[in-house]
C-alpha cells in the first residue's frame, strides 16, 4: 500500500490538469479539492462526518472513521472544455489523477488521515494577433501566452472527539509547486524587434487547517451537524522572478533584464461554515459557505519598467455549496437500495482581478452515485462516479463551459481485525 501511495503521489505531482486562460493570474485556478464521495454533491462537506469516507475538507470528521479499518481513496477525472470568445470557439480535453488520501482510527475517538491534493492549477497556451497599423495593414503582431505547472499539498491530520457530539481536528500540509508563464511578442516584419517576458515562481511552505464539528439530535430520526473551518494567513516565503528578453532584429543580439521580488506570495485567512441535516441515515443534506480573504494581499506585477508588488489585484473569494445524498439503506440486502445517490450545486466569486475588473465567476451543478463494491467478504468499499458541468465567465472576456467526469475508488480494508482459526 505504501508503494502504491508513493507511485500515485508522483503522478499527482506531475499533473497541471488544466486548460484555461484564466489560470494565468494569481496562483492559478484554485482546486475544488473534492473527493469521490462529495464530488457528486459539488464539494459540500464541512458538516459531513462519514464512517467509511475520507472527508479532508474538515479534519474534525476523522474522529468518525470506523475502528479496525483502513480507508484508501484515490480519484481520477476527465473533462472536455469549450471556450467561446466573440463567436470563436475551441475545445480542449484533459485527464488527470486528482488526489490520493487515506484514513484510519488511531485510538478511541481519534482518527488520522494523510494524503496528497491539488491546491491550484496553471495550464494555457493561446495567441492574439492584430495589425500593427489598422490603416496600412502592412505588418501584424502576434502575442503568445503560455503557462504550465501548479501547486500541491501533502497533508497529515488528526480528528478527536473529546465529548459526545463534539469533534475537533487539524491538518498540517506541505505546500509546494511552481508556475512558468511566458508572454512573447513577435512581428511578421523581421526588421521589428521582438520581446518576450518569462514569469516564474517556486513555492515550498506550509499550510494549516483547523476544523470543528458539533452534532445535535433534534428528533428521533433527525440529527444536525454544524461544521466550522479556519486556515490562518501567512507568507509563503517564495520569490517571484521575471526576466525580459529583447531581440534585435538587425543583428540578432539579445538584451536580457532580470527582476526578483522576495516574499511575494501569501495565503489569506480562510473561514468556512456548514450545516448537514441527517434524516434516518437516509437523507443527508448539506449547505456550506467559505470565504477566502484575498482582497488585502499584493501580487507581483510588471508595470512596464519594474517588477513590483501591487495592491488591487485580488478580491475576496466567496463560495456557496448546496448538496444532498440519498441512500435507502446502507446494509440493505438489495443492491440498488445500498447505492448512494447524490446531487449538488455551487456558486463561486473570483479571487483575481483582470485589468482592474473581477475575474471569472463560476456556476456548477453535479450529480453522481456511490456504488458498493461487492467482494467475497464485505461490500464496504465504494466506486464513486459523478458528472459535473461548470460555467466560468467574466464580463467581456472568454466564456468557458466544462463537462467533467469524476471517478473515485474508496477501499475499506480490515487492517486491524484479529482473525480466529476455527
What are these regions (language model features)?
Residues 15-39, 109-422:
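Outer-membrane beta-barrel porins/channels
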Residues 1-9:
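Bacterial N-terminal signal peptides
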Residues 12-118:
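N-terminal, post-signal peptide beta-strand-biased segments of exported outer-membrane/organellar beta-barrel
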Residues 3, 75, 103, 129, ...:
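Peripheral, non-catalytic segments of secretory and membrane proteins
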